[in-house]
From Swiss-Prot:
Family according to the record: Belongs to the HAM1 NTPase family.
EC category: hydrolase
HAMAP family noted in UniProt: HAM1_NTPase
Catalytic activity entry: ITP + H2O = IMP + diphosphate + H(+); dITP + H2O = dIMP + diphosphate + H(+); XTP + H2O = XMP + diphosphate + H(+)
Name of this chain's protein: Inosine triphosphate pyrophosphatase
Residues that bind ITP: 20-25, 60, 76-77, 93, 152-155, 175, 180-181
Known partners and oligomeric status: Homodimer.
Keyword Translocase: no
Subcellular locations according to the entry: Cytoplasm
Length: 205
């Protein structure tokens, strides 16, 4: 493992670009990463892809690295209903836009099984032509009628196992410790600590 980490050590031409146009998501990522990884954020118009979640995330990272001409971190989030064999999955954003929180609950009306899991996939591409690395976090829970502030996606309808609160009702510090995003970013932080990347650009560009 140490040999692999040493082999991965390299200089990055500039800080990692986290690709997002979602202010709430950016706020959460900044809270979780703190100053552990130097990154900047940028909204890019990447095409919406279909396929398996990890494949989608990797392909987005390849496209983003080509556009940015540098290292990028992209995120894809899934909400998977076990009764529906994993749907809505990576298409949760569109399901939520079309049906709202009540509609997500209605998808499971005919099923006793309300269990679900939230999955977050971060893909890191160190530059154009580089094969992306993926970091996956999962949190199991269940789908419930919406509770809590409705300002961050499907948080009000997802109640993680072992808790009486939905994501939306939780203090941010608690959610960030147990969430799918928090778990995936913990793996990203581990990778950066082991790889010991050095950013060449001091930010003057």
């Amino acid at each position: 493992m140490s040999g692999a980490a040493a082999a991965a050590a390299r200089a990055l031409p500039k800080a990692v670009t986290f690709v997002t146009g979602n202010a709430k998501k950016l706020e959460e990522v900044r809270a979780i990463l703190g100053s552990s990884i130097p990154f900047q954020s940028l909204k890019l118009d990447l095409p919406e892809l279909q396929g398996e979640p990890e494949d989608i995330s990797k392909e987005k990272a390849r496209m983003a690295a080509s556009q940015v001409n540098g290292p990028v971190l992209v995120e894809d989030t899934c909400l998977c209903f076990n009764a529906l064999k994993g749907l809505p999955g990576p298409y949760i954003k569109w399901f939520l836009e079309k049906t709202g929180h009540e509609g997500l609950n209605n998808l499971l009306l005919a099923y006793e099984d309300k269990s679900a899991f939230a999955m977050c996939i971060f893909s890191l591409a160190l530059g154009p032509g580089e094969e992306p690395m993926t970091f996956v976090g999962k949190t199991a829970g269940k789908i419930v009628p919406a509770r809590g502030p409705a300002d961050f996606g499907w948080d009000p309808v997802f109640q993680p196992d072992g808790f009486d609160q939905t994501y939306a009702e939780m203090p941010k510090s608690v959610k960030n410790q147990i969430s799918h995003r928090g778990k995936a970013l913990a793996l990203v932080k581990e990778h950066f600590a082991a790889a010991n990347y050095k950013v060449q650009n001091d930010g003057s560009a």
